[in-house]
Amino acid sequence: IFCKIMKKLYILLCGATAALLMAACQGGKTAAADAEAGDTLEMKYAKLLTIVKHGDVEETSDAAEGVDYQYTEAIIANPWKAGTMLHRYILIPKGEEGDKTVAMLARRHSTGARCTTDTVRTPVERSAVFIAPHCQLMYEMGCQQAIRGVCDLDYINIPDVKKRAALSGNTSAQNPIEDCGSSMAPDIERIIALNPEAILLSPFENSGGYGKLDKLHVPIIEAADYMESSPLGRAEWMKFYGMLFKKDGNAPKTALAVSCEPKADSLFAKIEKEYLKLKAEAAGYPKGLSILTERKTGNVWYVPGGQSTIGILLEDANARYIFEDDEHSGSLAMSPEQILAKGKQVDVWAFKYFGGAPLSQTQLLQEYDGYKALAAFSRGNIYQVDTSTVPYFELTSFHPELLLREFIILAHGERFGKLRFYKK
C-alpha cells in the first residue's frame, strides 16, 4: 500500500512539473516581453540573459494557504534569431514550500504555448557538465562537488577533475566524476547512471535538439554565454550559474547561506573592476602594436570579427587589429590570401595550438609557406599557447581581465607584467 501511495504522489508531482515544460515558443516574443512580473535583476553587459526574481508577498503569496511562493525566472534569448527565446528556466527551491510553488505555477500556466521551459529544483547537487570553462567556474564558486560527470575529459585542464575522474568505479570514493565521453555524442547510459539534476552544455545554431538527452527529462541548461559579444557580458552569466548551485561544506542550512549566488556576484564585481582598470590604463598609452590571431585551418583562416569578444578585447587593449572596422560579432572565414593581403605588415602573431612542443618557424612553413610573408613571422614576433597543458579556455572564458592583460602586454610591452598564457 505504501508503495502505491508513493507512486501516486510521484505521478502527481511529475504531472505538476510537466505542466511547466511546454515545448512551443510563441514567435516574435522577446525575452524581456515574455518575462513575468517580478524583480528584474540588472544585467550591465549580458544581452542574452534576463533574470527575474519572484517572492514579493503581494505578488506570489497565497493568504489562504499561508504560502509565500519563491522562485526565479531565467530567460535566455535566442542568439541566432533576434526577438525570440532559446529557453526559459524556473528555479524553485527544494523542499515542501518549493513543491507548493511547482503546483501553483502549474495551475497558473496550464494553458497557452510558451517557450521551452524547464523547472530546476535548487540547489542542484548532481550535474553533468559538458563544458570545461563551466567546470572551472564551479570550482571558483565553491560548488565543485556538484560536478558528477563531464564530457571531453582529455581536454579539461583542471587537476582535481582528472583526479576525481580516476576514482570512477570506486564505490568507496567520495564524489567521483564520471567520464561521459564526447560532448558531441555523450554516453547516455553513463549519464543515466549519474542521476543528474541538470545537464550543462553549449547550444548550437540549428542543432535540432539534443537527441537522447532530451528524452531523459532532465533540465538541460543551454549555456549560451559564449555567444555574448561583450567579454564582460559572458562573465556576467556567472550570476545565473551561481543561483543553480550551493556551496560545498557545512554551511548553515539557509537559502542564502548555501547558495553560490553571493560568491558569483562578488567574483563578477572583482572581475569587472579589474577589467575596467586595465582598459583605462591601456587607453592612456599611444595606440599599440597590431595583432593577428589564429592560424590557417585547411584552406580557411578563421579570425575574430571586429565586434566579437576577441575583437573587443583587442580594442580595449588599445591594440591595432586589421579587422577592427568589421561589424561581425562572430568569426570571419577568410582565405589565407585575404589575410596576407590585409595583414602582411602585422607586428604580432598570436595563436593557440593543442599538444606537443611549440611550433618552430620551420614547422609553420611546412604547414603553409605563405606565413613567411607576415612581418611578425620574419621578426620572430610569434606567440603561442598550448591549450593541452595551459588552462587557457578554462580561465579566460569567465575571466576576460586575464586575456585583456595578455593582449595589453603583446601590444604595449611588459610594463603590465609577464605573459601568463602566451609564450614567444
Question: What kind of region is each of these model predictions?
Answer:
Residues C3-L9:
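Positively charged n-region of N-terminal signal peptides that target proteins for export
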Residues L9-A18:
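Sec-dependent N-terminal signal peptides
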Residues L21-A24:
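C-terminal motif of bacterial Sec signal peptides marking the signal peptidase cleavage site
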Residues Q26-K424:
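N-terminal ligand-binding lobe of clamshell/alpha-beta domains
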